[in-house]
């Protein structure tokens, strides 16, 4: 099969080569023909900086987001040959930057019926990260998504801020918070993306080209928020400490918030760094919302398989609006 490979973990250089079609070996292995995948910013550094997690034995195929068709499944599996599926493959196993991949049954969900393969490939990592940040790691009531009025009322009293709001994860945070009935949804973005972020459901905007988060909250302390989802790290994570209320939550997918606490900030807040859990059952919940036309993936651009390098280059350069997707098969 054709596969994208990262030959040297110290370099972002990728090559397209031939590899054997993977053979199911784990009891949960499902063989899938890949139709599309999507790069993740930073994934080409994982093997270098997290060797305890990304072992040398991993075949270095990137692209952990998968959209494809089932070719074989374990006996008794809920998935059958021909099913259209999607998944986030655990980062310590070969990804979907190849014509075939082996997601685990626990990672898979049926593809949303109203999405194309391109849109489907843009969904798993970003939506799971946002969903789990808000409802598993965060303090939002997930029952609100199913219409529970008590949960909606609880969420309506909360304020949520997300950094890099136009990013793939940020756009999902805003949409899911909106659907959960959150009263205040604050997006940090650039001037050119303000209209886009408002269209997704943001009620307030911080234009980082005009002011940072700490300046924004210093102008009016009533702007403090209950939950911050940091998707970018760096100075934004440090500034977030000024905006979180006493007893609130800071959740980052980029670093440990406590390590970024500015000097002089003594407020008590819950903080955590977490890695996404590739749960197919969470994807099932997201699928229901997608099929009801309540949320949608945002696709920045699409790259052909043979031009794969452009996709990773664009993602690593930053400032994308949504996901960059790589077409693997001709079936779209």
Task: Pin down the residues of each PLM region.
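Eukaryotic N-terminal low-complexity, Ser/Thr- and Lys/Arg-rich leader segments
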Residues: 1-18, 24, 78, 147-151, ...
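Conserved hydrophobic beta-strands of the Rossmann-like cofactor-binding core
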Residues: 85, 159-162, 228
